[in-house]
Design a protein with these regions (language model features):
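Active-site-proximal cap/lid insertion segments
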Residues: 2-147, 151-170
Length: 171
C-alpha cells in the first residue's frame, strides 16, 4: 500500500483483481457473480443481451457463461476505477504510470487452452506521463516486457540477460 511511503517518494504497486476468475467454472459460479454484480451495480447482464461470436452455438450454458464473463468485466472496471480515483484523490495520478493487463484472453469454451483468437488477445492499456491518450499500437508484446518497462520507468537499467524490451522506448 503506497499510503505508507514518505511524501513525494516514488512507488510501485501491483494490484491484482480477480477479473474473469470471478465468474467461476459452472452455473453456481455464474449465478454468484451475477448476483454480486446486480447487488453492486443494480443490474446484471441479461442472456438476451449476449452476442456470441458466430462459431459458438447458442447453448444456454455458453450464453450464461458469457453473461457472467461480461459481468466480471463490469466488476473489474469498478475495481480499476477505485484505484484510479484514489490516485486522483491523492494528487499523484498525473505522475503515475498505470498499466492494465490480463494474464490471458477470454477463457470460454476454447479460448484459454487453445490457440483461438479470443484466448490470444490479451488487453494491455497504459496511461501516464508522456503517454498520448487514444494511441493504439500493434506491437507484439510479451508479459516479460512489462518487467523491462517497469525497470526503465524506475530508472533501473534492464539487465542484458533479460529477454525483454521496454515497449515504451523510442528504439
Amino acid at each position: 500500500d503506497w499510503s505508507q511511503r514518505k511524501k513525494g517518494q516514488p512507488f510501485f504497486a501491483q494490484i491484482q483483481t480477480p477479473g474473469g476468475k470471478l465468474r467461476g467454472k459452472n452455473v453456481e459460479g455464474w449465478n454468484k457473480i451475477q448476483a454480486t454484480v446486480e447487488k453492486a451495480l443494480g443490474s446484471r447482464t441479461s442472456s438476451n443481451a449476449v452476442r456470441l461470436p458466430p462459431y459458438y452455438p447458442r447453448h444456454p450454458d455458453i450464453v450464461q457463461d458469457w453473461a457472467a464473463y461480461l459481468d466480471s468485466v463490469r466488476m473489474t472496471d469498478v475495481m480499476v476505477g477505485e484505484v484510479i480515483a484514489r490516485l486522483e484523490k491523492e494528487g499523484v495520478r498525473d505522475n503515475t504510470l498505470v498499466l492494465f493487463m490480463t494474464d490471458h484472453g477470454i477463457s470460454h469454451g476454447r479460448g484459454k487452452q487453445f490457440l483461438y483468437e479470443e484466448g490470444l488477445h490479451v488487453p494491455l492499456i497504459i496511461t501516464g506521463p508522456k503517454i498520448i491518450a487514444g494511441t493504439v499500437r500493434e506491437d507484439l508484446v510479451e508479459h516479460i516486457d512489462i518487467a523491462a518497462l517497469s525497470l526503465a520507468a524506475a530508472g533501473i537499467q534492464i539487465p542484458q540477460y533479460m529477454q525483454a524490451k521496454n515497449i515504451l522506448a523510442n528504439d
